[in-house]
Structure formats: C-alpha cells, structure tokens
Amino acid sequence: MEKSFCSPLDITQIEQNFSEINPALTEAEALYEANRCLYCYDAPCTRACPTHIDVPSFIKKIASGNLQGSARVIFDANPIGATCARVCPVDVLCEGACVEKTLLQKPIEIGRLQRYATDHAMEGGKQLFTKGEPNGKSVGIVGSGPAGLACAMYLARLGYDVTVYERRALPGGLDTYGMAEYKMSQSVSQAEVEQVAQLGVRFLLNTKVVAAAPDDEVLGEINRVSFDLLQEWHDAVFLAVGLGETNKLNIPGEEMDGVVDALHFIEKVKTRDWKSVPLGKSVAVIGAGNTAIDAVTQAKRLGAERVTMVYRRSEKDIPAYDYEYELAKKDGVEFVWQAAPVGILAGENGSALSLRCEKTDGSLQLLDISCDMIIKAVGQQKMRSFFEKVAGVETDEKGRVVVNENMQTSKPGIFAGGDCVNGGAEAVDASQMGKLAAQGIHIALTGEDIRFAGDRQAKI
C-alpha cells in the first residue's frame, strides 16, 4: 500500500481497544450462573449445539467445583471448545435454545461458563485425554483448522498415527489467523493445538500439498509434498483445507495500492505488531458479513478516522449476526446501504482515492465514497482446482467437495470436511465435521462402527 499510514494511537490505547470484549467470569460469577441452570433432561441447549456438548453435565460439574471434569465433557465433544466459547454465535445456538429464555428469563451464559471451564484446563496445562494403543494405521490430515484438529484428536485417541500438513507457520487455521483479536488471541488456538499434539499428533508446518513435487521439495521456506505421496504414506487422507482467497470484485481499479482483502488485514492485526499494520485514515469495507464486521471494527479500533461499510442490499438483509452489527455501530462505523461497487478511482500517486458505487435502489445513481484504503470482505473462493487437479475428488456446482454421510469423497480413502464441504460456516460446524470424518475413517479402515461424545451411542 503505497499511500500507507499506521495507527495514530499509542500502544496502550490500542491494547485497551483490543482487549477481549467478553471478559472471563470470576469464580463467584461462574458459581452463581452455574446454579441458575435447571440441568434439563434432553436439554434443548445440547441439541442446539452442532457438536452436541452435554451442556447440563459440564455446568453441573462447575457448580460442584469439578472444573477439570467439566472441561473434559466439553473437549470430549468439541476439541476446540475454548475457541467456540469465545466465537460461537451462542445467542442463536445453545443460549438461544435455553429453557430460561423460553420462560422470558435471561438465558444461562453457557458460552462464558464454557470458557471458565476450558480456561482452567488449559491454563493448568492439564492433559484431558490419552493416546490410544497404536493400531498400526496411519492418517494424513491436510489443514489444521477446526475440522483438521478435531479429526486428529479423535483418531489419535483411537491409536492412529496422525500427521497434519499445514501450509502456514502456525497451526489452527482461521482460529489462529482469522478471528478478530478482540474476540480471541492466538494463545487460545495454540493451547488447543497443544492438547492435540500431546496425543502424539505430528504437525508439519510450512508444508504445502500440491499436485506433483519431489519428496519434501523445499522452495524458500515452504516444503512442497505431492498428494500422491500422501496417499502412499497413509492409509487414509482427510482434507480440511477450508476456503481460498477472497473473491474478486471484477471492477476497474481493484489492483490499485490501498486495496486489500479482509482476511489479510485481519491476519496482520493478529500479529499484534500494531504499528506495522497498514491503515488508511478513511477506510471503506465492502461487504456486510461477519468478516466485514471484524474488518470495520478493527480498523476503527486501530484509530482510522472514518470507517464506512458498503453493502449492495438493504440494512434488513445484512448477513452478519445482530450482535456483530451492534458492535460495529457502537464503535462508530458508518454504513452505506444499497450501493454496489463499480470502480475504484485513483489519486495523483496512483493509489486508491475513492470507491465509486451504483445505487441498487432503482435510481442507478452514482455515489463516490472518499477513502484511502479499501478492504474487500465479499466471501472466499472455493478451492475447486485443488480438489479436482490435486486430490481428484468430485465437487458440486458451487465448488464444494461432495461427501457421503461418513465424510468420504468420491475417491476411496479420501475424506473431507469443514468449510471446503459446507461452503463456509461456523468453527463449531467444522469441528463436528472433523469428528464425523474420524468416525468415517475408522469405519472404513477397521469395519468397526464407533461414535464419539455428542452421540447417544458414544463409545469413547
């Protein structure tokens, strides 16, 4: 970004702006909240959780002072339970289904109680599970996000030799690189990774899986390994590669300096090297999903003078969750509705000067929004090329990998899950798909049907 600025705020102010928006419960608060729970039989909160955490059980253990037991219940059903305690949309999942809410009372703060228990386990470095007796079988997992981590944990507990291939320097996927810093720091996802690593799972970082490459070819700091070799080395392969780069706008000026994508911006913020994050004085963010909200709020908290979110539909159509939208409004973000970007105009130095939009309210009026930085948050591309050319598996018309009920792809021995299958959902959904894939892999390799925590027939 040629015309680059950095945050005008001092480090102390920035640190304060990026402190977690939902602080941890104190012991007294946790005990009070846990004792409000009715411990429902066939609890609707458990049914509303995609990983089916036994919510009454873990809350009851908090009430009795058994925090390690509580954390075990959580991580048994969801290996990224600490992450989900912070980033899950609990108001539309577990807390949204709480019986107290149906009685017109305040729902139990399930998310914060979940954080209380999982923080206790991770801060104490407690290992909650043990590696299973080696069974002589090996599984390779491509990607270390929620789906990959979940699959790895369950397979390791069953005795599989598990290797995770991750193209980045740190494992954790979007939990590490893509969550707004005020929601969750990288230390949380790394603590969950450590839980999995302690089960004997190997993480090969800076390693990219490609169509064809010599064994362990090194290009710069990145190792390249061919997918064919993965199939030779392992009895099964699980693809948990998520989604690709941000979609293109396909408008004039998109390649100018000062135009960045939201994921790269958020990733830069995650380094916490605050003064190195390129930041315009006036920032326009295109899109209105949860990633767009993360971008506008973080730009504002870094000290941008003006931040505007631009969306082609009306306010009532905003795809972001209500609480995310309210946060952006509270932070002083401005909104332009029913405006579709049609071009980016340059200043004298060739960098972005304004975003030209066409009104979608029927007037076709042109609107220029002055800005010196534009952030694209318009969804991510599907990795169709990777799946068809590298892995050789079938994708649907939207570029999503086609799987059966056991998460197996069209190619025997190859499984897939997470955003690359569902097109992009919550971290908790990806975790559940990783769990289902581990079950499917075990069934395929041993013929033994097995169900993990969160299933009425759970066996481990």
Where are each of the predicted segments found?
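Conserved hydrophobic helix-helix packing surfaces used for dimerization/oligomerization
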Residues: 139-141, 162, 283, 307, ...
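N-terminal Rossmann-like FAD-binding beta1-loop-alpha1 element of flavoenzymes
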Residues: 138-163, 292-300
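Feature captures the FAD/FMN-dependent oxidoreductase FAD-binding
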Residues: 133, 138-142, 190-251, 343-354, ...
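Beta1/beta-strand and adjacent pyrophosphate-binding region of the FAD-binding site
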Residues: 133-147, 279-286
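FAD-site-proximal beta/loop scaffold in flavoenzymes
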Residues: 255-280, 370-424
